From Swiss-Prot:
Domain named RNase H type-1: residues: 1-141
Family: Belongs to the RNase H family.
Alphabetical GO biological process terms: DNA replication, removal of RNA primer
InterPro entries: RNase_H, RNaseH-like_sf, RNaseH_domain, RNaseH_sf, RNaseHI
Record protein name field: Ribonuclease H
Location (main, coarse): cytoplasm
Keyword Cytoplasm: yes
Catalytic activity: Endonucleolytic cleavage to 5'-phosphomonoester
Assembly, per entry: Monomer.
Gene: rnhA
Entry note: cofactor: Binds 1 Mg(2+) ion per subunit. May bind a second metal ion at a regulatory site, or after substrate binding.
CDD domains the record matches: RNase_HI_prokaryote_like
Length: 150
């Protein structure tokens, strides 16, 4: 399987509010930047969409090292998702999982790949994390303008 390194980030102005996500994919000497956003969303949804969009962009099975500064994503995928799935996508106190649509999409995106998850401290000088943050802010800016116009 092809090795890929992914760095992701999400951003939101207000929570909820306009938001953006960004991802950098590196494979060999090739690098690809992805970004997007929504007019009305949350930071956690943007963090999830960054990881989902990056994984869905891969066209064949890969071994992935995915770096995120989101404890929500890291804990969700590393600890919580297994119980959610076993409990029919309900939390331990029987409430529906927040952002279940995105967690299910992330779960599906993982099936083709071997993914190792890494947490990095945000805004701490990690070059790729800073670049992913800028892409997320670019996506946010585009959708902040849309929410003001539309």
């Amino acid at each position: 399987m092809r090795p890929v390194i992914i760095h992701t980030d999400g951003a939101c102005s207000g929570n909820p509010g306009p938001g953006g996500w960004g991802a950098i994919l590196k494979f060999g000497d090739t690098e690809k930047e992805l970004k997007g956003g929504e007019a009305h969303t949350t930071n956690n949804r943007m963090e999830l969409l960054a990881a989902i969009s990056a994984l869905e962009a891969l066209t064949r099975p890969c071994t992935v090292d995915l770096y995120t500064d989101s404890q929500y994503v890291k804990n969700g995928i590393g600890s919580w998702i297994h119980n959610w799935k076993r409990n029919g996508w309900k939390t331990a106190d029987k409430k529906p999982v927040k952002n279940v649509d995105l967690w299910q999409r992330l779960d599906a995106a993982l099936k083709s790949h071997e993914v190792r998850w890494h947490w990095v401290k945000g805004h701490a000088g990690h070059d790729e994390n800073e670049r992913a943050d800028q892409l997320a802010r670019d996506g946010l800016t585009k959708h902040r303008l849309k929410s003001r116009i539309g």
